[in-house]
Swiss-Prot record:
Gene source species: Leishmania infantum
CDD domains linked to this entry: Ribosomal_P0_L10e
Record's GO cellular component terms: cytosolic large ribosomal subunit
Ranges of biased composition (kind: Acidic residues): 308-317
GO biological process, one term: cytoplasmic translation
Name of the protein this chain belongs to: Large ribosomal subunit protein uL10
């Protein structure tokens, strides 16, 4: 049987070899995961990754020693800094090393998710709702429902839940009454699995929030950004590949409006036909709308000229009255 020192040395060599050989490290949570489940996950990952457990104090010392070596790479030093800053090597966690895509590893972990009953004292990872309907329980067992304030009635000799009831919320501690009722209803509400907490990939640390982002979310953010940039460029009059089309259309509309207002006709691009259509109100869009105030502008001086004699007569009449 190897000594403790030899075992630690072999563990250190394996951990350093994995940190050097693989570009991606997944920090995974192991809460409520049983040994058989861990064994099954390790066997499924055998061709894709290496799964390592161990004392976090020992792992931290090995990572720190690797970063303080004379020939330590900048990435090794940065990895140690990130582990210390975010306290990655702590709690009931494991390490998965791989060069494959993270999605391949998470798909294996999801495939080994196990359904479990709610045990007394366990922390609920999800909301648990008891659905309405017949329970198949005899009327003598209504006390279990009364303890949780669940409205029931007797129908066809069986206890029936009137309305659905939430018995657990995320973070709640399972008490004896809730655990007993869920067991009698044959409800196993919890799912446990090796859960990815964070990922170190080629010198970049991705947190749990980063990992929750999907390709659709990233695509939506990029499209919104491109739309905002295009709107700013269009408003500022800066031609780009996405704004040159609308800018040319707006410029042509302005030319057509000027043509309508000044009686100038241009033959290019069906200018004469479009001008006649705008004058006759047959052209939809802002061209005819822009042409209306321009065409109405010359009529304003003539209207003012007609009003001038009336104003002058009133002025003369008023002056004559004074003298």
């Amino acid at each position: 049987m190897p000594s403790i020192t030899t075992a630690k040395r072999e563990y250190e060599e394996r951990l350093v070899d994995c940190l050097t050989k693989y570009s991606c490290v997944l920090f995974v949570g192991m809460d409520n995961v049983r040994s058989q489940q861990v064994h099954d996950v390790g066997r499924a990952l055998r061709a894709k990754a290496e799964f390592m457990m161990g004392k976090k104090t020992l792992q931290g010392k090995i990572v720190e020693k690797r970063a303080q070596a004379k020939d330590a790479s900048p990435e090794a030093k940065h990895f140690n800094d990130q582990c210390e800053e975010y306290n990655l090597l702590s709690g009931n966690t494991g390490l998965i090393f791989t060069n494959n895509a993270v999605q391949e590893i998470t798909s294996v972990l999801d495939a080994h998710r196990v359904k479990r009953a709610a045990r007394v004292g366990a922390i609920s990872p999800c909301d648990v709702i008891v659905a309405a309907g017949s329970t198949g329980m005899e009327p003598t067992q209504t006390s279990f429902f009364q303890a949780l304030n669940i409205a029931t009635k007797i129908a066809k000799g069986m206890v029936e839940i009137v309305t659905e009831k939430k018995v657990l919320s995320v973070g709640d501690k399972v008490d004896n009454s809730t655990a007993t009722l869920l067991q009698k209803l044959n409800i196993s509400p919890f799912y446990y699995q090796v859960n990815v907490l964070s990922v170190w990939d080629r010198g970049v640390l991705f947190t749990r929030e980063d990992l929750m982002m999907t390709e659709d979310m990233v695509e939506k953010m990029l499209m919104e950004g491109l739309s905002n940039v295009a709107a700013m460029a269009l408003g500022a009059g800066i031609p780009t590949s996405s704004t040159i089309g609308p800018m040319l259309v707006d410029a042509f509309k302005n030319l057509l409006a000027v043509s309508v207002a000044t009686s100038y006709e241009f033959e290019e691009h069906n200018g004469k036909e479009l001008r006649e259509a705008a004058i006759n109100g047959l052209l939809a869009g802002s061209c005819s709308a822009a042409a209306e105030p321009a065409a109405a502008a010359p009529a304003a001086p003539s209207a003012a000229a007609k009003e001038e004699p009336e104003e002058s007569d009133e002025d003369d009449f008023g002056m004559g009255g004074l003298f």
